[in-house]
């Protein structure tokens, strides 16, 4: 009988330690109200809230480790009305947050109905800008090629003009040499003619003086 009582007390203590049936204790994190239960059934003070699931059961039972007259327990525990009040405030806060998000989204969308249309419009604008830049680059390349062709034509024209001037100068030089050779021959012929005329004049002079 004593063993049975001892077994029941140990079993009850084990249940009190391993199962948390207390109220929804608020855990304030980033201004939001969270309620957790321990998945493995072994409640500890250092349980990670991120690994605990949300508890939807509403209870006003106090924690096993806290007495009924504990001032800290009365401050930490919330009634059902208070919890619904807090939840209502959270809903209002969430509504305001969603309203701000919708305003920021509408501002980001720039008058479009959805992100898909906005992204399609942006992609069209980017495509148009890319096509315009590609067209401008093509025009610049064609103008550059035209400038190169004009420069090459001007250079070839200058080369042709220079070669033409060289040929013309060479022909003029040859003609001048030919003329100078002809003038030299004429000069020699003229000198011979003058000498012959001088000889004849001297002979005529001597003949005239003798008479």
Curated annotation (Swiss-Prot):
GO cellular component, one term: extracellular region
Pfam family, one: Fibin
Quaternary structure and partners: Homodimer; disulfide-linked. Seems to also exist as monomers.
The keyword Signal is assigned to this record: yes
Keyword Protein biosynthesis: no
Family: Belongs to the FIBIN family.
Molecular function terms from GO: protein homodimerization activity
InterPro entries to which the protein is assigned, alphabetical: Fibin (IPR026772)
Signal sequence segment: 1-18
Name of the protein in question: Fin bud initiation factor homolog
Keywords for the protein's UniProt record, in alphabetical order: Disulfide bond, Endoplasmic reticulum, Glycoprotein, Golgi apparatus, Secreted, Signal
Superkingdom of this protein's organism: Eukaryota
Gene: FIBIN
Main location as per UniProt: secreted
Compartments where located: Secreted; Golgi apparatus; Endoplasmic reticulum
Glycosylated residues in this chain: 30
């Amino acid at each position: 009988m004593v063993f049975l009582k001892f077994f029941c007390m140990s079993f009850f203590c084990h249940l009190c330690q391993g199962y948390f049936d207390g109220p929804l204790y608020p855990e304030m994190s980033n201004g939001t109200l969270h309620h957790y239960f321990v998945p493995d059934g072994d409640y500890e003070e250092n349980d990670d809230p991120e690994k605990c699931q949300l508890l939807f059961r509403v209870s006003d039972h106090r924690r096993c480790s806290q007495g009924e007259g504990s001032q800290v327990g009365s401050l930490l525990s919330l009634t059902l009305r208070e919890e619904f009040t807090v939840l209502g405030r959270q809903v209002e806060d969430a509504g305001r947050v969603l309203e701000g998000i919708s305003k920021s989204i509408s501002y980001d969308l720039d008058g479009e109905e959805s992100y898909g249309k906005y992204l399609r419009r942006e992609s069209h604008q980017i495509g148009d800008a890319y096509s315009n830049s590609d067209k401008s680059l093509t025009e610049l390349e064609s103008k550059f090629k035209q400038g190169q062709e004009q420069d090459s034509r001007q250079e070839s024209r200058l080369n042709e003009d220079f070669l033409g001037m060289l040929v013309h100068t060479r022909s003029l030089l040859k003609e001048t040499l030919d003329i100078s050779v002809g003038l030299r021959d004429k000069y020699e012929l003229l000198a011979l003619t003058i000498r012959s005329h001088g000889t004849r004049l001297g002979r005529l002079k001597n003949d005239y003086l003798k008479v």
